[in-house]
């Protein structure tokens, strides 16, 4: 319905995961219950045939923290290491919402840091600082820093979800149409849709 968000289908070994992603503000603005948004997605002509005959085995909802680096809490304390959603390790990049990869990597790093702290006999905040150091050296914090302002950019640039994807579609379509006519140059094929968006 033109709302900021997205949907996904993940193929697993024996199951398929189907879901939607919507910001709280869009859910309120759209005035459509989240479960109805999911049903609307499942009933799309591109999706319905893929899941037809499937049996619902699990249903869940999850609020994803989009605070990112700016809202990240202290990552270590006495006897505590924080990772994943609890540490605001999530990024909305417009085309995807990342979090699972960051949580898994941070969890692995947390395990290594905890093992080091236990071996050293020091699970205090100071003894667990190696987690922060290892995390800073990993792709997790590098990516969190790289994309820390992206949520604000997305909110200020709604064209990312409508006009730009349509522009890309309009550029790509003529490249794959065989109609017996000579092809325009790539530049000419691209310029019309680009000018239309501005």
Protein language model features and the residues they cover:
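Conserved FAD/dinucleotide-binding core of flavoprotein oxidoreductases
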Residues: 2-63, 98, 116, 120, ...
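Generic structural "secondary-structure junction" signal
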Residues: 53, 66, 71, 95, ...
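FAD-binding beta-loop-beta segment adjacent to the flavin cofactor pocket
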Residues: 62-94, 136, 141-144, 159-160
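C-terminal catalytic lobe of FAD-dependent flavoproteins
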Residues: 12, 28-50, 72-93, 98-105, ...
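An acidic- and aromatic-residue-enriched active-site/binding cleft used to recognize and process polar
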Residues: 21-23, 86, 149
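Active-site-proximal substrate-binding core of FAD-dependent oxidoreductases
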Residues: 90, 108-162
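A general structural signal for short secondary-structure boundary/capping elements
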Residues: 53-58, 65-67, 125-128, 176-183, ...
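C-terminal auxiliary extensions adjacent to catalytic cores
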Residues: 154-198
